[in-house]
A protein has these predicted regions:
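Bacterial N-terminal signal peptides that target proteins for export
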Residues: 1-8
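Hydrophobic helical h-region of N-terminal Sec-dependent signal peptides
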Residues: 9-13
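N-terminal signal peptide c-region/cleavage motif recognized by signal peptidases
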Residues: 16-19
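Cleaved targeting-peptide boundary
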Residues: 21-27
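Mature N-terminal segment immediately following signal peptide/propeptide cleavage
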Residues: 27-50
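Catalytic glycan-binding domains that act on GlcNAc-containing polysaccharides
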Residues: 44-268
């Protein structure tokens, strides 16, 4: 995940999660046992939790990274976009538009989100799935952040959602790999968004946001559509569609970058 998006995430503690009872801090193994009980109450099987938590330990690198983040952003839009949207990325995005033209037509018809917006997000997040999707075991990362007492309820909710991804059969534990806040896949969904918005668009019976391009793009479109994005309208700053993208990223500068990139892709 891009660090601007991570900085926004870690400042937001109002994500809708259930009231969770596991107590943060203290002995990590005791905390994991409490989380396992929470998971069982939420319908997660003992087989899943047992496999997920066997030998799990805190990851000091995750805490160190998290505590180093700066939650202010001082670049202008012009400075920021120049580092994120260059000729190579624009050309790569146009190639994706051509390669997946039929898929984009299906997605636009079902979800009403224009293809250039989806390609812009895809490119910014992981360079169209070719870049860094994160290399950390999501369960360990989220258990570490949930045990830390600063945003424990937020990350306990994400941890339970990650377990549900495994329970549903969407991804096996070996593929549940992500970034420093537990983001997963080619457009870097948090586990709660994976559960809420994920779409099996390739028809294989599971939502795979790491390997399936149809699932990745349709799920991204579903998130935007569900939050009010409408085909044919402006997506520039001040528009209803620009506001709908808040669910993707609260940062105005990031949403302006998505809009700028999208326009470049279609020659506007």
């Amino acid at each position: 995940m891009h660090r601007l998006r991570l900085a926004i995430l870690v400042c937001v503690v109002t994500l809708a999660t259930p009231a969770l009872a596991a107590k943060c801090g203290g002995d990590f193994n005791s905390f994991v046992a409490s989380i396992s009980a929470e998971a069982a109450a939420a319908g997660i099987s003992q087989g899943v939790t047992g496999q997920a938590f066997v030998g799990v330990t805190e990851d000091a690198s995750v805490l160190n990274f998290d505590r180093r983040q700066r939650y202010t952003f001082n670049k202008s839009f012009e400075q920021y976009v120049s580092t994120r949207v260059g000729a190579g990325r624009i050309n790569g995005g146009r190639a994706m538009l051509q390669r997946h033209a039929a898929l984009f037509s299906r997605i636009e018809a079902q979800f009403g989100v224009p293809r250039q917006i989806l390609v812009a997000i895809w490119g910014l997040e992981t360079d169209f799935g070719k870049g860094d999707m994160g290399r950390l075991p999501v369960i360990r990362t989220l258990a570490t952040l949930a045990h830390d007492c600063r945003r424990t309820e937020l990350f306990q909710g994400e941890l339970l959602a990650a377990l549900k991804i495994v329970q549903r059969g969407d991804l096996p534990l070996r593929d549940l790999i992500g970034a420093y806040a537990g983001e997963i896949g080619q457009t870097q969904f948090l586990p709660s968004s994976y559960i809420k918005y994920g779409v099996d668009f390739d028809g294989d019976g599971r939502v795979d946001l790491r390997h399936s391009v149809p699932d990745v793009l349709a799920s991204t479109a579903n998130l935007l559509h569900t939050n009010g994005f409408k085909m044919g309208g402006s997506y520039e700053e001040g528009s209803a569609n620009f506001e709908a993208m808040r669910e993707w990223n609260h940062a105005t500068i990031y949403r302006k970058t998505i809009a700028y990139f999208a326009d470049q892709l279609v020659g506007r």
